[in-house]
Every structure is written in C-alpha cells, then in structure tokens.
Amino acid sequence: INSLLASAKKVINSKLSNKQKKVMFNEGTEKPYSSELLNEKRKGFYHCANCGNKLFASNSKFDSGTGWPSFSEALPGAFKTKTDYSFGMERVEYHCAKCGAHHGHVFNDGPRESGKRFCSNGLCLIFKPD
C-alpha cells in the first residue's frame, strides 16, 4: 500500500478542503459528530471525495453510536488495508483502492451480518442519492 499512497499524493483533487487533505493524505481523523453525513438516511452510494470511486451502498450504513458514519460492508474491491500501530494500539486502516486516500479504520464489532464496522471520516465521502 505504501506505493499506492505515494502515487495518490500526486493526484490530490484540487477541490478538496485543507481539512479533507489532512484526513485523507496525512491519515488524520475528523472530530466525532461533525460530519453532515452522519444522519444521512437516503438511498444511494458513498464515493471517495478525492477520486469519486464508489465505496459503500447506503443499505450498509448503520448507527454505531461512535459519532462517525459507519458501514457494515464495503463494495467489492473498494479498499486496501494496512495495519496502524499509532496511539499504542493495533488497528486496521482502510484506504481507497483507486487513489490511496485514507478513509478510516475497520473493526470487528459491527452488525451480525458481517461483523465489520467501517468507521469512516465523513470528510472523505461524497454521498450521491439514487
């Protein structure tokens, strides 16, 4: 993934805000409960804010109570993962498979169907309703 991330930094969308760039290309985290997408309930798809890659279907979104948009499953091939050892813990970070932008972390405490919780920074997503 390191080579993927290196190439992604060369194709940063010029329309991204400074906050988006910090989260997506410096592996930052937005404040909990700050995303406008947290309460989005319409049917549609969530895309990478940098490259437009389709990442999640709205029917996989659920309220995890964490303050970040959460999804039980990603679309096939949407992400690449890497282990994150920051803050004295081991977590799995996920990045857009197309451009390498950081989106969040995936945990094994999600709904029964998948057991996964993709905890996403809302700044990294664009919602497109059906």
Regions found by a protein language model. Name each.
Residues 1-3:
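N-terminal low-complexity segments that are often proline-rich with Ser/Thr-Pro
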Residues 5-130:
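A short Gly-Trp-Pro
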